[in-house]
């Protein structure tokens, strides 16, 4: 046994070794192949991908915000401009102790508790490794103090930014609007519109007025610089720069001095005035009072200040010129006259006797005239001059609500005017369908009668009243009211183009002249309701006044402003144009509850004198219109 086991099978062992070596070799070869294949995949196939990833760690794209376009008035006066402001920023990840740093900054830059609270709020919603504002709008002294102490505050620096500034404060807020910080709602909208990338480094966006409407024109195109950074995120060198394209400057049709002058006339009143050039539709002034300072919103208005504006009973946040809706009252009588003449309901000689009231046929219901004892025999011209309600009650009855609504819609009532502001209401031009939908009730004949004098369910904005007036002045040719005069491209002005709209009625009918002659009589003839304000002017004026009732009077009750609450007093309205034979200016005005100063006719004359004569020394009756209701019909 011992002898037999001492002999080994070298052949078998050799064969086993060879097999094992071959398997090991094949395993090594396979693993080497996998390694080579992976190396090929990384170095050749996915080279661009991994190079991009490497560059993303080493190369950063830093967006450069564009400079926002400047807004000028028609004479080249800047109304909204950019000025450099400095703000203190901190990157918390580069600061050892944020709270200690904030405490140390108190004495250096006059840091307040509100500043610190704002920083912490902003930090909570910011990404890592982003600079967060600590204090905005630093003074030169604060910037200098920090520069001396900057070595003590790693991770903290002062940066300069262009910030919007409105030098004329409240005078233009409802026209220019304002920019403010981009919020989540803005981000969602920009993302849906595919514009978010162009706001990568922009802090503000147009929120209201011209700033909002022409945001795409004013904003510009964001640039960027390609920089190489080290492992700490510090810039080593600049590799490439694509400069931003500044936003385009725009010129408005507004006249700043006229705007400011009208604002002084309306001081203390809730009121609106729209002044246009009827030849072009250009808006020379658009004033709504009271107003507010738009600069409050640029840096972010405080909750206290915003709450005060929001809860102000005089509603300064509302643009009364485009968003205020009121019964247009007797200012619509010239347009009703043109409509009735065009429809063949009346002629220039159609007469009516006015005893001071008009009775609905087949009914005991009487509609009173503002003049208790009546106007006597009337034709359309005299009815306009004396603003006789009874004549237009009859006209409305004969026209019917369907024709009346159709014609007034042609004058722009119940529709947006096309003004280049987003903040506009369409008012209401009532129809049978509207009442059925709104009140679930049919239209009655009695509903039509007050519509004939601009009352009832009819509401309109001052900008609509002005557009209708321009249509009358131009014999039915429609001019869209607009604020943009031109934009600037490559240093050259690009003028705004008036869109074509179909005319209203027959521009050669001669009916327009009848209505305008009635307005001329209002301002110049002895029986005209506003002749005492305008007859003495060295140029000729045509006008139409109106009184919009805030609440109804009982039968045989007399209006007395002294006995009712100020908020229940009648609104005073007026439209006017001048010079009569070659109109260059059209004005629409409303004084809510009669205003707080001179009569509506006095203010209108002062505005027209300022435009036509270049002075503001008009001396006219200045009684508060709340005292007298009848003569301003």
Model-flagged regions — what are they?
Residues 2-11, 80, 229-239, 279-331, ...:
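Beta-lactam-recognizing serine transpeptidase/beta-lactamase-like catalytic domain environment
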Residues 1-303, 325, 347-348, 402-412, ...:
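Periplasmic/cell-envelope proteins involved in peptidoglycan metabolism and beta-lactam response
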């Amino acid at each position: 046994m011992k002898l037999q086991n001492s002999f080994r099978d070298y052949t078998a062992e050799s064969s086993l070794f060879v097999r094992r070596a071959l398997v090991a070799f094949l395993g090594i070869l396979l693993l080497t192949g996998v390694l080579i294949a992976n190396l090929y995949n990384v170095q050749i196939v996915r080279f661009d991908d991994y190079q991009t990833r490497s560059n993303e760690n080493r190369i950063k794209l830093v967006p450069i915000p564009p400079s926002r376009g400047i807004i000028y008035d028609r004479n080249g006066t800047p109304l909204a401009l950019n000025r450099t402001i400095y703000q203190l920023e901190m990157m918390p990840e580069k600061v050892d102790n944020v709270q200690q740093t904030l405490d140390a900054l108190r004495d250096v830059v006059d840091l307040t508790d509100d500043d610190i609270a704002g920083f912490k709020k902003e930090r909570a919603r910011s990404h890592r490794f982003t600079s967060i504002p600590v204090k905005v709008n630093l003074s030169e002294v604060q910037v200098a103090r920090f520069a001396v102490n900057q070595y003590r505050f790693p991770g903290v620096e002062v940066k300069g930014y262009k910030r919007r500034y409105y030098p004329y404060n409240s005078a233009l807020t409802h026209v220019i609007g304002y920019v403010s910080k981009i919020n989540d709602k803005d981000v969602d909208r920009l993302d849906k519109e595919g514009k978010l990338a162009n706001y990568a480094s922009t802090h503000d966006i147009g929120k209201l007025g011209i700033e909002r409407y022409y945001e795409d024109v004013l904003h510009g195109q964001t640039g960027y610089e390609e920089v190489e950074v080290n492992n700490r995120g510090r810039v080593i060198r600049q590799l490439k720069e694509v400069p931003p394209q500044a936003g385009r400057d725009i010129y408005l049709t507004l006249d700043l001095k006229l705007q400011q002058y009208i604002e002084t006339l309306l001081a203390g009143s809730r009121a609106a005035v729209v002044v246009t050039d009827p030849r072009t539709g250009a808006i020379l002034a658009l004033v709504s009072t009271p107003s507010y300072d738009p600069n409050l919103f640029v840096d972010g208005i405080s909750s206290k200040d915003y709450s005060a504006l929001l809860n102000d009973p005089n509603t300064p946040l509302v643009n009364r010129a485009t968003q205020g809706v009121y019964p247009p009252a007797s200012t619509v009588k010239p347009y009703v006259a043109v409509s009735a003449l065009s429809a063949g309901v009346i002629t220039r000689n159609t007469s009516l006797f006015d005893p001071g009231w008009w009775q609905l046929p087949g009914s005991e219901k009487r509609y009173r005239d503002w003049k208790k004892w009546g106007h006597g025999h009337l034709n359309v011209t005299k009815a306009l001059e004396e603003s006789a309600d009874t004549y237009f009650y009859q006209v409305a009855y004969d026209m019917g609500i369907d024709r009346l609504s159709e014609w007034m819609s042609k004058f722009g009532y119940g529709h947006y005017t096309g003004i280049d502001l987003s903040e506009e209401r369409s008012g209401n031009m009532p129809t049978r369908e509207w009442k059925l939908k709104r009140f679930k009730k049919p239209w009655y004949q009695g509903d039509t009668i007050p519509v004939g004098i601009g009352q009832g369910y009819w509401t309109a904005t001052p900008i609509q009243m002005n557009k209708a007036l321009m249509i009358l002045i131009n014999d039915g040719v429609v001019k869209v009211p607009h604020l943009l005069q031109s934009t600037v491209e490559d240093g050259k002005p690009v003028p705004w183009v008036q869109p074509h709209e179909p005319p209203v009625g027959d521009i050669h009918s001669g009916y327009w002249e009848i209505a305008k002659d009635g307005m001329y009589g209002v301002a110049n003839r002895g029986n005209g309701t506003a002749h005492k304000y305008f007859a003495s002017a060295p140029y000729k004026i045509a006008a139409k006044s109106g009184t919009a009732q805030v609440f109804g009077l009982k039968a045989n009750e007399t209006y007395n402003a002294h006995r009712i609450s100020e908020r229940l007093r009648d609104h005073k309205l007026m439209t006017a144009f001048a010079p009569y034979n070659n109109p260059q200016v059209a004005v629409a005005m409303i004084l809510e509850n009669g205003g707080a100063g001179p009569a509506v006719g006095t203010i209108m004359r002062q505005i027209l004198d300022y435009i036509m004569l270049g002075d503001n020394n008009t001396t006219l009756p200045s009684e508060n219109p709340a005292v007298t209701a009848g003569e301003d019909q």
